[in-house]
Structures are given as C-alpha cells and as structure tokens.
C-alpha cells in the first residue's frame, strides 16, 4: 500500500501550540517562509518570528507560538550576535556576494591596521541603511527601489556595536578575508558594517557569509534545522519547543500562592513584601487550577505593588 503524502491526507485542524522553536535557518530561506513552514509542520494556530534574518544569512531565528507571541517584541528589541566573513578588496552593489562588482582595489592591510579600524566602529555609530534592505520608504521596501535601479535618500540611524572580535584573518590570500563576531543592538546592518570597514581600510569590502548565533539570551545551543523538524514525528516536533518562559529567563522570578495567583490572573494589583528593586519587571509563577505552579505572566514591581502587564493563558 502506497503511503499518502501529507498534502493527500485529510487536512488536520490547527491547534493551540505554545512555546518557542529555536530554528537554525538555512541559507536561501526568508524568515517568513521559514515561519510558515514551521507553523504548518506544528499545525499551530498562531505564530510569529522575532525579527527578520536575510535569506543569505543562516543561524538563529526564534519562532514564537501561541502565548509566546506576547513576548516576541522583547526579542525584537534585544541585542543580536553574528559571525560574519568579510571579503576585502571588492565592493559590490549590494554590499554582499550577490551584487555586481563596483570596484576592486589592492589589499595592503596589517593586523594592527585592522584592529585600529575595527575599534572605530565599537560603540554608538551612525549607519545609512543599505538599498537592498526591507526598511520601508513611503510604504515601499528599499529593495524594491533597488531592483528598479533607483536610489533613494536614506537617513542615517544610530545603532550600538557592543563588541567586535576578530575570529580569523587571511589578509595575504588572493581573496583576503576577515571573520568577525559582532554583538550589536537591533537595527544594525552587518553588510553595511562590512562595507564601511572596507572603506576605513582603504580597500573596500563586502559580506560573503553571515550567521546569527545569539538573540538576547537565546543561543544556537539546541537549535533545530528545518530538515530535522520535517523528519521528526508529531510528538517529537512538540518536544522540540522550549517553554514560553524561555524568553523570560533574564527577569527575576516571583511565586504566588493560590489566592494571589487567582487575583493576578484577573489583572488585580497585589501589594506584596518582596526583596526586589522597584520599577523592575518580573516573571510571575503560581497555581493555575490543578496544574500546579506555572507561568502566569509578566508584571511590573514598583512601590511594593505587583502590577500585571502581560498575562499568559496556557
């Protein structure tokens, strides 16, 4: 008997799925396409990603399902860490390997010059977003203007580079490269950083590889590929999800008794005696029916009062 393909089987209803999938996005996939595929494989009703990763980039793409989507904005705001391979000596139209070569210059860069140039980009810097980006101008993504051969004025944006570490160099090769680890704020374009570094070195440069390794406190440890997700059984796929509170591990933990838990879930403010500084966000756990202690949500702690901000309904 021939096994039916998934598309030939009776359509399975969408279901409530709650948690975070740490996806190791493959090259060539857009973030949205990867999200749609994972959502279908999990038969999830609700899902969202936590910031786009270019199709040419690989690496960590946290996908939020169900109640975890309430905290996806926190990851959008979080710092990111990337590993980037920059090819020196060639500048392209897209600042990456996909573009047309605009110029070629000889590379005569010493390790000392490289370190000095990199130091100029650590801290708060102004970046002009690349034309080949999803940033919108008058409601239209910049890459659409670029594909039409148009260049539009873009205002520089202030971003923060926390650290740049040199992982490897091959400065004397026929195709000289430098491999960097970059920890940066949201909105930082690594392609632009690579291009600007090339200009600072006087030789030009473009990005040839990019991999995201960390988003906030989440890392590639335990991340799953789309291939592994597709090959897994339904139960195995569900087990690959991290719990909702995986997004909240940097927040202090507060546990409530049964009565305070009930009041918290009704959105009531709770005067409590807690050894925590004021104005701090906390993750709140407590009794939920017969389920025992579980995540109830996130609250603000100020002036001895716990104020519910985002409730979780699991």
From Swiss-Prot:
<dbReference type="GO" id="GO:0031119">
    <property type="term" value="P:tRNA pseudouridine synthesis"/>
</dbReference>
<dbReference type="Pfam" id="PF16198">
    <property type="entry name" value="TruB_C_2"/>
</dbReference>
<dbReference type="Pfam" id="PF09157">
    <property type="entry name" value="TruB-C_2"/>
</dbReference>
<dbReference type="InterPro" id="IPR032819">
    <property type="entry name" value="TruB_C"/>
</dbReference>
<comment type="similarity">
    <text>Belongs to the pseudouridine synthase TruB family. Type 1 subfamily.</text>
</comment>
<dbReference type="InterPro" id="IPR015947">
    <property type="entry name" value="PUA-like_sf"/>
</dbReference>
<dbReference type="InterPro" id="IPR014780">
    <property type="entry name" value="tRNA_psdUridine_synth_TruB"/>
</dbReference>
<dbReference type="GO" id="GO:0160148">
    <property type="term" value="F:tRNA pseudouridine(55) synthase activity"/>
</dbReference>
<dbReference type="InterPro" id="IPR036974">
    <property type="entry name" value="PUA_sf"/>
</dbReference>
<feature type="active site" description="Nucleophile">
    <location>
        <position position="54"/>
    </location>
</feature>
<keyword id="KW-0413">Isomerase</keyword>
<comment type="function">
    <text>Responsible for synthesis of pseudouridine from uracil-55 in the psi GC loop of transfer RNAs.</text>
</comment>
<protein>
    <recommendedName>
        <fullName>tRNA pseudouridine synthase B</fullName>
        <ecNumber>5.4.99.25</ecNumber>
    </recommendedName>
</protein>
<dbReference type="InterPro" id="IPR015240">
    <property type="entry name" value="tRNA_sdUridine_synth_fam1_C"/>
</dbReference>
<dbReference type="InterPro" id="IPR020103">
    <property type="entry name" value="PsdUridine_synth_cat_dom_sf"/>
</dbReference>
<dbReference type="InterPro" id="IPR002501">
    <property type="entry name" value="PsdUridine_synth_N"/>
</dbReference>
<dbReference type="GO" id="GO:1990481">
    <property type="term" value="P:mRNA pseudouridine synthesis"/>
</dbReference>
<keyword id="KW-0819">tRNA processing</keyword>
<dbReference type="GO" id="GO:0003723">
    <property type="term" value="F:RNA binding"/>
</dbReference>
<dbReference type="Pfam" id="PF01509">
    <property type="entry name" value="TruB_N"/>
</dbReference>
């Amino acid at each position: 008997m021939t096994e039916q393909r998934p598309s030939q089987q009776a359509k399975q209803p969408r279901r409530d799925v709650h948690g975070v999938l740490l996806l190791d996005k493959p090259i060539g996939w857009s973030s949205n396409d990867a999200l749609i595929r994972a959502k279908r494989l999990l038969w999830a009703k609700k899902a969202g990603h936590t910031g786009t990763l270019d199709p040419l980039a690989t690496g960590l793409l946290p996908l939020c399902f169900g109640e975890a989507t309430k905290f996806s904005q926190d990851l959008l705001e979080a710092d990111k860490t990337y590993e980037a391979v920059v090819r020196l000596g060639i500048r392209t139209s897209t600042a990456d390997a996909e573009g047309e070569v605009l110029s070629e210059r000889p590379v005569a860069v010493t390790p000392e010059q490289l370190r000095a140039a990199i130091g100029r980009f650590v801290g708060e810097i102004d970046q002009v977003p690349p034309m080949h980006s999803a940033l919108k101008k008058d409601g239209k993504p910049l890459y659409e203007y670029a594909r039409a051969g148009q260049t539009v004025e873009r205002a520089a944006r202030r971003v923060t580079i926390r650290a740049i570490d040199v992982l490897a160099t091959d400065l004397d090769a026929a195709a000289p490269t430098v491999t960097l680890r970059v920890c940066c704020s949201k909105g930082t374009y690594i392609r632009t950083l690579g291009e600007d570094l090339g200009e600072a070195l006087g030789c030009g440069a473009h990005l040839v590889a990019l991999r995201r390794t960390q988003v906030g406190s989440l890392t590639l440890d335990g991340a799953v590929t789309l291939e592994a997700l597709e090959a897994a059984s339904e139960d195995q796929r569900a087990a690959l999800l991290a719990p909702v509170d995986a997004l909240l591990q940097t927040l202090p933990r507060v546990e409530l008794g049964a009565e305070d838990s009930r009041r918290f879930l009704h959105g009531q403010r709770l005067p409590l005696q807690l050894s925590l500084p004021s104005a701090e966000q906390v993750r709140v756990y407590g009794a939920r029916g017969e389920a025992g202690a579980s995540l109830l949500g996130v609250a603000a702690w100020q002036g001895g009062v716990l104020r519910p901000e985002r409730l979780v309904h699991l």
